Amino acid sequence: MKMDTGTKVRTILFLIAWVNQLLSFDNLEPIPVDETTAQQVYDAVSVLFTIVVTVWTSFKNNYLTLKGRKQREALKKNGLTK
């Protein structure tokens, strides 16, 4: 399956965000933090990052399906996209 660079970047960030979130739920942070305040900040930033990346990937046309790839080709054919 051929994907454009933007789709690849968004998909990778999406996966990183969700893996990080799942690890955070199980208290398996890559960098152990002992201070309570630092942990709360980390959790808040982690949730915010996950929400932002999820919204970004949801609303951006990623052309992942066959229909989406056909739409991208039609847009390119008619000069309506980069």
Swiss-Prot record:
It is found in: Host cell inner membrane. It is a multi-pass membrane protein. Residues 1-8, 58-82 are cytoplasmic. The chain crosses the membrane at residues 9-25, 41-57. InterPro entries: Holin. Its main location: host cell. One of its GO terms (cellular component) is membrane. Residues 26-40 are periplasmic. Pfam families: Holin_SPP1. It comes from the Viruses. GO terms for biological process: killing of cells of another organism. The keyword Lipoprotein does not apply. The keyword Cytoplasm does not apply. Keywords: Cytolysis, Host cell inner membrane, Host cell lysis by virus, Host cell membrane, Host membrane, Membrane, Transmembrane, Transmembrane helix, Viral release from host cell. This is Putative antiholin.
